[in-house]
Amino acid sequence: LGLGYELASQLIDKGWLVAGIDFNAERQAELTAQWPADSYRAYIGDITDEAFVKESVADIASLGHIDLLINNAGQPSFKVPTAYEAADVDKCLKGLKGMILWTVETLQVCGERDVKIAQIMSTAATRGNANESVYCATKWGEKGYTKSLQAAYKGTSVKVVAIYPGGIDTAFYRDSHDYVSEDKQHTFMQPGPLAEVILFNLI
């Protein structure tokens, strides 16, 4: 299971009501069955669909004040620079576009006050990796957006936190084992302890 699951699970254990967003309806059905309705609400859709974002955030806000937004979406694309095609670029850019749309809508419904926004990115936002040019470009874009938010809301009750984890041992690499072998993947950090560290610094 991934970092998003661990974050949701640990927040629920702490008594939070978590709204989870995913395009995978089957996975959301499993989570809805696992957790009670007063702990977890599932939203199924494309994080880059503006209408879906607006409708979902409005519904979430109707449940109460949004205290924390965690932007954790992202898909990898690991190739040599000349192998990238438009579809690869679009896939990587979904994470950046989704981050922006969910952040903007959340800030609006919160009146730009009393909210924490956690942007979970990657060490790929801090350097260039030979076979991750488009992925790194997306993550650098997320970093630039996050730093701009931090500048815009400095000294206010809007707190924007940047998180740059390295490799995590999850299914994130399931289609990339030609680049990151399963053996190497299993040397990466586990999502549970990472989620603990992130939440310790957020709540």
Report each predicted region and the residues it spans.
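Rossmann-fold scaffold of SDR-type NAD(P)-dependent oxidoreductases
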Residues: I66-G74, G95, Q119, V161
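Active-site-adjacent segment of SDR/Rossmann-fold oxidoreductases
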Residues: C110, R127, S148-V158
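Canonical Rossmann dinucleotide-binding motif of NAD(H)/NADP(H)-dependent dehydrogenases/reductases
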Residues: L1-L17
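Conserved mid-core segment of classical short-chain dehydrogenase/reductases
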Residues: K54, P76-D90, N131-V134, Y173
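Catalytic Tyr-X3-Lys loop
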Residues: Q75, T82-L101, A118, E142
